[in-house]
Amino acid sequence: MNDLPIAPIDRLIRKSGAERVSEDASEAMSKVIVEFVQDLSAQAYKLAKHAGRKTITAEDIQFAAKEF
């Protein structure tokens, strides 16, 4: 079970040019997205904590994304 609805994931995949997308493909993409966001958030949290903050900022997210 995923936390993200499948329909928006399906639309994102189709927006990249795919004409048809299987439900399995959308579910797999959803799992990858959730894992990526969790990893990115963990890295952003480390950056905020290192800076002495409890709040993650947009800059933390952007910096963490550059490290990936």
Language-model segment annotations:
Residues M1-F68:
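Terminal helix-to-tail segments of small alpha-helical proteins
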